[in-house]
């Protein structure tokens, strides 16, 4: 499947949304909203669109894509698994594919969705419901997740955590000699239970090196605030941000498929699945 642009404000992004919907094979929903361009490359979300103002110059539609695997006895509680499916489109005629940012996270989320759907079909439904959200507009200021938390399709109080996946397909400079790692950010900021659960699940399954370098409040890059999970955390919802870190191809046209490490991408995806499965099926919530 080829797409000419992954910029959230290009009509091609709607084709990507449809592809995500068709590929996950679970109940899904498109959350459409409008954004307005100003100053040439800046965008803002329109929270009160009307039949008239959506026809204004610079106004364009975009969509979050949501998928649901309904739980059983605790189905009114939700585990959110998120990624963003937009990138930065093209510059001077050059396509920026964003294979890692965030193609890797989007594919991981879709694989996890299919795994939960398969488990449910085989009679192993999770106790809590799993809400998968592919956000749009992350690169332009977390627009999709910001819109969602202000217009949630389920009450925010029913969401027990967000597991956010953004760039998990590469090996950064700090781990050239040890590829089996993943950075975890934010697991202990709101819920101590989530942090302990995450570490225990890792020890009993993939046993990756969990690197907390970017979790430090003194981290100069402040990655905790730079992806869609922060809009959930700002509403008191526990989160984990999974990433493999930055690399020289970040936001460059060289962020391409051939540079993805599929072996470690698979392991990181499996870890997130096991973590989500444990959260969805445990007796207690997260404190």
PLM segments and residue spans:
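Short, small-residue-biased leader/transition segments that mark boundaries at the very start
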Residues: 1-2
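Solvent-exposed loop/turn segments at secondary-structure junctions
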Residues: 38, 60, 73-74, 85-89, ...
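Structural recognition of the beta-strand scaffold that forms the well-ordered cores
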Residues: 32, 64-68, 78-82, 131-134, ...
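Soluble metallo-hydrolase cores and metallopeptidase-like ectodomains found primarily
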Residues: 6-98, 114, 118-122
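Active-site alpha-helical elements of protease catalytic centers
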Residues: 100-114
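Short helix-loop-beta-strand segments that form the rim/entrance of peptidase-like active sites
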Residues: 111-141, 162-165
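Metal-dependent peptidase/peptidase-like ectodomains
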Residues: 135-241
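His/Asp/Glu-rich mid-to-C-terminal helical/loop segments that flank catalytic regions of hydrolases
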Residues: 114, 243-287
């Amino acid at each position: 499947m080829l797409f000419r642009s992954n910029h959230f404000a290009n009509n091609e992004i709607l084709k990507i949304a449809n592809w995500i919907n068709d590929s996950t094979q679970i109940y899904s929903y498109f959350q459409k909203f409008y954004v307005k361009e100003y100053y040439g490359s800046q965008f803002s979300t329109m929270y009160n669109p009307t039949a008239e103002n959506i026809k204004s110059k610079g106004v364009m539609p975009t969509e979050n894509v949501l998928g649901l695997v309904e739980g059983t006895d605790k189905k009114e509680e939700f585990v959110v698994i998120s990624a963003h499916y937009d990138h930065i489109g093209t510059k001077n005629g050059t396509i920026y594919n964003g294979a890692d940012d965030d193609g890797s996270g989007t594919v991981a989320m879709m694989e996890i969705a299919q795994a939960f759907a398969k488990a449910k079909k085989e009679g192993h439904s999770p106790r809590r419901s799993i809400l998968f959200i592919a956000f749009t507009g992350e690169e332009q200021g977390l627009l999709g997740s910001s819109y969602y938390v202000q217009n949630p399709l389920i009450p925010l109080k029913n969401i027990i955590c967000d597991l956010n996946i953004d760039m998990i397909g590469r090996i950064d400079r700090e781990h050239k000699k040890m590829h089996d790692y993943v950075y975890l950010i934010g697991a202990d900021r709101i819920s101590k239970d989530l942090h302990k659960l995450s570490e225990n699940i890792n020890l009993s399954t993939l046993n990756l090196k969990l690197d907390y370098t970017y979790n430090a409040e003194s981290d100069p890059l402040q990655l905790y605030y730079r992806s869609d999970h922060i809009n959930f955390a700002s509403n008191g919802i526990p989160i984990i941000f999974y990433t493999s870190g930055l690399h020289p191809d970040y936001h460059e046209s060289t962020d391409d498929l051939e540079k993805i490490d599929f072996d470690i991408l698979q392991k990181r995806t499996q870890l997130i699945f096991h973590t989500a499965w444990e959260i969805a099926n445990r007796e207690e919530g997260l404190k």
